[in-house]
């Protein structure tokens, strides 16, 4: 996941305070501040501070400073980083060197005459290292470029905003950078059958979902059906656009980081993946999980190659899958031959993580 920080370095505290408040409102996780501002920033809200001060949440020193500062900070459980201004090849080599120290979590890079080439070199050089690369950016285009360099891009951007709108635009960019596109396939319905009652899970999120959005859920990790959010108007019950009536407690749901979780494991505050009919994703937050006994329905489908996959949902008109045209279709209206959208995964799962292993799911 890409992340972004804000630099609050205006001359006047009142201006810096507004930058911090804008960052809080835009869900920016951390701000780089002057050492004397740390306590004042903490009074404004729950946001991480970045500075040289050992009392910061993320302790960052400049190139040439004593690295034992970071070693000591790491022992105290702090995150650590080195700010490096890239002015010559030696600076790039220094960045590569300190990135291999196990007590350094971040390198924060500011390009001078050259910016893109040093970033490309370091992204390639440090591909397998346990380090996060952060690039300083002073406008949205520079931030976007940094996120996209060599397709992989930097892990994060330290952004210097011009005004409140700049902070919000940056937050929007981060959300877009984290919006992965998944490949969705279609499967043909072969059976729809009422199977009795069981414990069903509703996922109420902190997001308002739109038509075409839902979550990827299924009984098998290799085939997750797109279950539509409760956004469709009907004459009997009010819509719940924040909700996906997901399925029984045993079912998998796809979460951020390409990990699956059992529906029964979810709780308030957990991250969840919202997926639309075209496979575009965005991150959501679970606000509440409801588990209730409800009548259930087995849905069986066949996809290319003759593979049969199944899922179970509540037997009710308001539960919908998504058909081949991207439209929601109620599970009570499903019939043999209908096509619905799902995500096929050839990997097995171990504690929710994709692995190369043979597994049989029935």
UniProtKB/Swiss-Prot annotation:
The keyword Metal-binding does not apply. GO terms for biological process: amino acid biosynthetic process; aromatic amino acid family biosynthetic process. Pfam families: DHQS. Its EC number is 1.4.1.24. The gene is aroB'. PANTHER family: 3-DEHYDROQUINATE SYNTHASE, PTHR33563. This is 3-dehydroquinate synthase. GO terms for molecular function: 3-dehydroquinate synthase activity; dehydroquinate synthase activity; NAD binding. It comes from the Archaea. Belongs to the archaeal-type DHQ synthase family. Keywords: Amino-acid biosynthesis, Aromatic amino acid biosynthesis, NAD, Oxidoreductase. Catalyzes the oxidative deamination and cyclization of 2-amino-3,7-dideoxy-D-threo-hept-6-ulosonic acid (ADH) to yield 3-dehydroquinate (DHQ), which is fed into the canonical shikimic pathway of aromatic amino acid biosynthesis. The keyword Glycoprotein does not apply. It is an enzyme of class 1 (oxidoreductase). It catalyses: 2-amino-2,3,7-trideoxy-D-lyxo-hept-6-ulosonate + NAD(+) + H2O = 3-dehydroquinate + NH4(+) + NADH + H(+). Signal peptide: none annotated. It comes from Methanococcus aeolicus (strain ATCC BAA-1280 / DSM 17508 / OCM 812 / Nankai-3).
